[in-house]
Amino acid sequence: MEYFAFQWHITDACDQRCKHCYIFAEDACKQQDAMTWPQMQDTFYNCLDFCEVYHRLPYFYITGGDPILHPSFWDLLGLMKEHHIPFTILGNPFHLNDEVCRRMKEYGCEKYQLSLDGLRQTHDWFRKPGSFDCTLEKIACLKRAGIRAVVMTTVSGTNIDEIPELIDTVVAHKADV
């Protein structure tokens, strides 16, 4: 049976204010929002029902904002574990440590997607000062827990000339590109 992937935005809460983010765009800036726990449960079971009807296996990409900031983040991971549903988290590095990564792995997290949008100066301008170094540091943290650390880059005219060196940097830090 084939997988059907759901990218699930559970919260707008985020520690960064990325230049290219739709949540905090100047003309669309709005109050931060998040799904309630009952909404999350309903959505989860609706996705499972969909997959049953279409003979697919569910796979979730949990994102936001930074999903780890959602007050029901661990409840959601518990629900995933209870139903043996594989998932990837697309989030920030700031709340990761060995304990958090170990716990995510216990719940079944397969991959954690981090973002690097250029070398230090460019990336920190895009996202938040200190984010570049923190992101590289957390690759090792994720890997120690047995979670694949993958890196995504939003390529633009601002960073395109840095991409070859960025790839070398990510490979040197042993990301699971």
Question: Residues of each region from the PLM?
Answer:
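Conserved alpha-helical substructure of the radical SAM core
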Residues: 1-110
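Short acidic-hydrophobic sequence patches enriched in Asp/Glu that either
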Residues: 35, 39, 115, 131-134
